[in-house]
Amino acid sequence: MGKAAKKKYSGATSSKQVSAEKHLSSVFKFNTDLGQHILKNPLVAQGIVDKAQIRPSDVVLEVGPGTGNLTVRILEQAKNVVAVEMDPRMAAELTKRVRGTPVEKKLEIMLGDFMKTELPYFDICISNTPYQISSPLVFKLINQPRPPRVSILMFQREFALRLLARPGDSLYCRLSANVQMWANVTHIMKVGKNNFRPPPQVESSVVRLEIKNPRPQVDYNEWDGLLRIVFVRKNRTISAGFKSTTVMDILEKNYKTFLAMNNEMVDDTKGSMHDVVKEKIDTVLKETDLGDKRAGKCDQNDFLRLLYAFHQVGIHFS
């Protein structure tokens, strides 16, 4: 990766980039509250773009392009780039940077909040992600009607490690289990804080996220709903998570909805609705032999087995 980058970037190019960044720093102050930490190392920037394996026919979505250090490299390889930028100052600087160049017409800048923006079709996503939207960004990509073929995403190191964590790891959590259901995640590189201007307080990592195709035949909201319950306390038993009054209230409500949709009636001889739902939960946990397991030790197959068993008795999570 380093050798390929050296062929493309001479010392003169790096000096020009540094001068531009110093100019920007004097023009306006970076807003770190918006996650504005500009990637300044050209070798890292080129490495990120290379890992995306962009085809000449690809439309690339870039989230948070900033001053365009990644953007200009993506434009060299992609058919088009759609850059979503929240800060008008950054958008203006990026516009100036490509103005009058051969790639100017290949760039579309969408000004606004990524999480509130309706996205066009795109093949690849590349992002030096504002860390405060890391989790929402991942799930927005996963839930796109036509998800990207691949996403190359820069995250805070600890967040990236949570995406990669396996059952039994200390960082394994609901995020790990949820994302790994829908996508394959691999680690690409570590990026030190000194590669950014201004330097963030934490180290970063770049991950490659490939959404599974075909998509697993599981309802996203049902899967997410189950995980929210079992991971409330990942080191407690799964059965403990179902003893919460709040959880029971939700599941009772969902069960009533299930009965109404199927024109079924509650069997009054079995007690109250609460008793009926509790009995179903206890039965499922016993029959699956998962009641005494800890979510932090369970894998995808365990959770799928649990979800299927609950559905079989009419218990739903969304």
UniProtKB/Swiss-Prot annotation:
Q: Which Pfam families match?
A: RrnaAD (PF00398)
Record's InterPro entries? Answer: KsgA/Erm, rRNA_Ade_Mease_Trfase_CS, rRNA_Ade_methylase_Trfase_N, rRNA_adenine_dimethylase, SAM-dependent_MTases_sf
Q: Which UniProt keywords apply?
A: Cytoplasm, Methyltransferase, Nucleus, Ribosome biogenesis, RNA-binding, rRNA processing, S-adenosyl-L-methionine, Transferase
Q: What is its main location?
A: cytoplasm
Q: Which residues hold S-adenosyl-L-methionine?
A: H37, L39, G64, E85, D113, N128
**Functional note:** Specifically dimethylates two adjacent adenosines in the loop of a conserved hairpin near the 3'-end of 18S rRNA in the 40S particle.
Q: What Gene3D superfamilies is this protein classified in? A: 1.10.8.480, Vaccinia Virus protein VP39
Q: Which domain of life is it from?
A: Eukaryota
- What is the E.C. number? 2.1.1.183
Q: Which GO terms describe its biological process?
A: maturation of SSU-rRNA from tricistronic rRNA transcript (SSU-rRNA, 5.8S rRNA, LSU-rRNA); rRNA methylation; rRNA modification
Entry keyword annotation includes S-adenosyl-L-methionine: yes
What top-tier enzyme class does this entry carry? transferase
The record lists the catalysed reaction(s) as:
adenosine(1779)/adenosine(1780) in 18S rRNA + 4 S-adenosyl-L-methionine = N(6)-dimethyladenosine(1779)/N(6)-dimethyladenosine(1780) in 18S rRNA + 4 S-adenosyl-L-homocysteine + 4 H(+)
Q: Name one GO cellular component term.
A: cytoplasm
One GO term in the molecular function aspect is: RNA binding
Q: What protein am I looking at?
A: Dimethyladenosine transferase
Q: Which family does it belong to?
A: Belongs to the class I-like SAM-binding methyltransferase superfamily. rRNA adenine N(6)-methyltransferase family.
Where is this protein found? Cytoplasm; Nucleus, Nucleolus
